[in-house]
A protein has these predicted regions:
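A structural motif specific to WD40 beta-propellers
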Residues: 10-13, 51-54, 91-95, 132-135, ...
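Conserved Ser/Thr-centered positions that define the repeating blades of beta-propeller domains
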Residues: 3-4, 44-45, 85-86, 125-126, ...
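Entry beta-strands of beta-propeller and related beta-repeat scaffolds
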Residues: 31-34, 72-75, 113-116, 153-156, ...
Length: 220
């Protein structure tokens, strides 16, 4: 769906899409990419007016996460691992060397590294995805649903409402759960110095102190 009035009204923008379940979005300059659950990746070059499949080289039809770093695009799939494109999605190459889990939930592209959250741990690459090393020391629940950058720190969220902070680029992690209920996490977003955690049963929680304390923000 597309809105041109800050979300007040929405219109369908599905021309060319053959799958209606969208799991990921990526905007790269004027191009929009969406990852679907059944038919892979689609690209729009006209603000969503039409879409074309961009699946050459992709062995998975379920694209769960997307990221961009410089001239490289990255796609995380379910059970087929990571893919990289160097030509704006025209073709893709699998880049799983070192990944022991190939169900990719999330991708974070920083200036020099890539981080991916999987159903069995967090992995880091310092060479645009050519090789991966596990980077989740201190994380007990390794079903990582999201990883994000907060200033010079990294924040990771696991499925069971566990949020972790790393101050050394992912080498070690500390649990920051004060105020969070038990249950499942669905999403993590950073806005300035604020961290927002979406949950399955308990709404949205906010931390304004680098994850040290959390409060529900569900008014409305």
């Amino acid at each position: 769906f597309f809105s041109s009035d800050t979300g007040n009204t929405w219109t369908s923008a599905n021309n060319g899409l053959t799958s209606s379940t969208i799991y990921s979005f990526l905007i790269n300059n004027s191009d929009i990419f969406v990852g679907t659950s059944a038919d892979g990746l689609f690209l729009s070059t006209n603000n969503g007016a039409s879409w074309n499949a961009q699946n050459t080289g992709l062995a998975s039809s379920f694209v769960h996460s997307l990221a961009v770093s410089g001239s490289n695009l990255f796609a995380g799939s379910n059970y087929k691992g990571m893919y990289r494109s160097t030509n704006n999605g025209n073709s893709w190459s699998q880049i799983n060397n070192g990944l022991t889990s190939t169900f990719i939930n999330s991708i974070l592209a920083t200036t020099n590294e890539l981080f991916v959250g999987t159903v069995n741990g967090l992995f880091m690459s310092a060479d645009t995805g050519n090789t991966w090393v596990q980077s989740d020391s201190g994380i007990t629940n390794k079903f990582i649903i999201a990883v994000a950058k907060l200033g010079s720190h990294l924040i990771a969220a696991s499925y069971l409402n566990e949020v972790y902070l790393s101050v050394n680029n992912g080498s070690t992690w500390n649990l920051l759960n004060n105020g969070l209920p038990t249950g499942g996490s669905s999403s993590l977003v950073i806005s300035g110095s604020n961290i927002f955690l979406g949950t399955y049963q308990n709404g949205v929680f906010l931390s304004a102190d680098t994850g040290n304390t959390w409060n529900a923000v569900n008014n409305g």
